[in-house]
Amino acid sequence: MRRNSKERKNRATRRSQGSYQEIIGRTWIFRGAHRGRVTRRNIIWHELIGLRVRIVGSTHPAFVGIEGYVIDETRNMLVIAGDRIWKVPKDVCIFEFEADDGTKIKIPGERLVGRPEMRLKKRWKKW
């Protein structure tokens, strides 16, 4: 799209701005030093991007069995890169995250709904 003789990105609504396709196959970029601090008690407040995840239950049967790395998180969705890119709603799934030490943490998606920065401020009952 040209405007004032300058090339600009197409900012049309409902169009993806970032192409995640170039990320597939490059899982090494997700192995950061922060991954070792995830525990069963703090996963609700922790950064989910970069964690390995698998969907173990869902009200939609096509989502069950999806696995890969979380590459983006919005208020209601997780973007998971595995053999392809999946955009999965949080509230209908049960997720199983893998910590760096190999422990598997199962958590219902209803607990994860909300913007990541707002989840830090929210008070939770004992988890």
UniProtKB/Swiss-Prot annotation:
It catalyses: Endonucleolytic cleavage of RNA, removing 5'-extranucleotides from tRNA precursor. GO terms for cellular component: cytoplasm; ribonuclease P complex. It is found in: Cytoplasm. GO terms for molecular function: ribonuclease P activity; RNA binding. Changing residue 95 to A: 75% reconstituted RNase P activity. Optimum temperature is 70 degrees Celsius. Keywords: Cytoplasm, Endonuclease, Hydrolase, Nuclease, tRNA processing. SUPFAM superfamilies: Rof/RNase P subunit-like. Part of ribonuclease P (RNase P), a protein complex that generates mature tRNA molecules by cleaving their 5'-ends. Binds RNase P RNA. This is Ribonuclease P protein component 1. It comes from Pyrococcus horikoshii (strain ATCC 700860 / DSM 12428 / JCM 9974 / NBRC 100139 / OT-3). The lineage of its organism: Archaea, Methanobacteriati, Methanobacteriota, Thermococci, Thermococcales.
